[in-house]
Amino acid sequence: MYAVMFAMYRKDGLSPEEFVAHYRDTHIPLTRRFAGLRQYDVFPVEGGEGPDAFAVMAFDSADDFQAIVDTEDFKEAMADSETFVERTDSYVVGHIPIVAGASAIRA
């Protein structure tokens, strides 16, 4: 698995609620068209300083991720990002599964 984590900061003038609504209603539908995207999770941050949301996109390989970067779908999603995201920090991350489900938690 190849995963990229994004820390996103909303544009000045957007409330946290407006940021999340745009992300959910406009941006996520654009990213659903990415071929090779295996998983996409978004974590809005509740209150406080720092990023307004984290997102993790997972692919089978770095090549699969790179392949979408050159597509019109990706360019459209990036253009949309510029309308509501001031800054994005990105990181290639590993994955250490901890809990597979509620049944995995036992004393």
Name what the model sees in each region:
Residues 1-107:
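Macromolecular interaction modules
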